[in-house]
Amino acid sequence: MKATGIVVEYNPFHNGHKLHLNKARELTQADVVIAVMSGSFVQRGEPAIIPKWERAKMALSAGVDMVVELPVSFATQHATIFAEEAVRILDAIHIDTLFFGSEHGVAEDFTFAAKKVVENEARFDEAIQLALVDKKTSYARAYTEAFKKLFGQNLLDITKPNNILGFHYALAVQKQNPSISLQTIPREHAGYHDEEASHDQIASATAIRKLILAGKLEEASHYLPASSIDILRNYEGPFLSWTDYWSFLQYRLIQASTEELEGIRGVSEGIQNRMQQAATKAQNFSDFIELTKTKRYSNARLQRTALQILLNAKSKASSPYIRILGMNKTGQKYLSLHKKNISLPIVTTVSKAPPGLLEEELRATNIYTLVKKLENYQAGDFHIPPILTL
């Protein structure tokens, strides 16, 4: 069976995702499409708008054959680690092709750039460190400057969010298994971070979340496939954002010692001091980010760091594993064919997982479900089985 892998968040699953999924199957001639999906919290350092099980239902209803959870210790980190670990899982499942959307739209350029960076890794790292000498330069900007020095201005614009992820997927493939082929399609109609819906049927997940959180589900439904609309209408819990977790974060920052925060993943250069000061002044999470940010720290990096503090995530990340959230008959057939040759631990029943393997994931789910009206999902990692569909 020919397998295509995709890396997703489906926060929520919308028409743009449906287009991407259909193209992934069509252009790669895949027998099975496997999605590695973020769980309770996502890469920008935010809570997912609805629980991972509801989003897995959306994926399966739309035609994904297998949904595998990207562990929270990787799903909530910067693009390098996010991509490396997603590719590690997909490689372990033996995909043939990695398919992604990008602003650039030419897979060969991603592969070329990744090969050159691997071949010139020492020089590339040196250029990054040189750019970081300026204390006001963020790591993302330093990375972009080093990339431009190596390739010039025209090969890839890695300031674009999907291009940078695509580049890191290509880099991970080159380092882990260059036999995996890459395919990409140009992202159309809506930019990744666009906050307003401006196209008849396609809008960014950011714009769709904004509508849903404002109580405009019917308006948001113009940009969602019917299966996603049904799941959202039947969902009985709250639609979530940082607003729901602000008081928990504020408490953590106020009660924790500076030394304790220094041991949290992503905390460096004294950022915990700014965060602790901001926590005593901010009225809400948006205020907190405004009070904390500097030229060196992007909003996304601050959100990720705040999330690691909320989750009490220690510097050492968990080991990778394959956690099945759901699959259809095709996905089940594929898993049964390859199960013996998969090198990572496969988790379908959490209570039977190796001790400690899912510790960070379980804690993240418990914190995610502290919000009212999520009682049905509390300890869900234990009592909600993988979704199996026909």
UniProtKB/Swiss-Prot annotation:
Main location class: cytoplasm
**Gene Ontology biological process:** tRNA modification
Q: Where does ATP bind?
A: 7-20, 101, 162, 187
Q: Which UniProt keywords apply?
A: ATP-binding, Cytoplasm, Ligase, Nucleotide-binding, RNA-binding, tRNA processing, tRNA-binding
Reaction catalysed by this chain?
cytidine(34) in elongator tRNA(Met) + acetate + ATP = N(4)-acetylcytidine(34) in elongator tRNA(Met) + AMP + diphosphate
Q: Which GO terms describe its cellular component?
A: cytoplasm
Q: Which Pfam families match?
A: HIGH_NTase1 (PF05636)
So what does this one do? Catalyzes the formation of N(4)-acetylcytidine (ac(4)C) at the wobble position of elongator tRNA(Met), using acetate and ATP as substrates. First activates an acetate ion to form acetyladenylate (Ac-AMP) and then transfers the acetyl group to tRNA to form ac(4)C34.
User: What family does this chain come from, according to its entry?
Assistant: Belongs to the TmcAL family.
Report what the protein is called. Answer: tRNA(Met) cytidine acetate ligase
Q: What's the source species for this entry?
A: Listeria monocytogenes serovar 1/2a (strain ATCC BAA-679 / EGD-e)
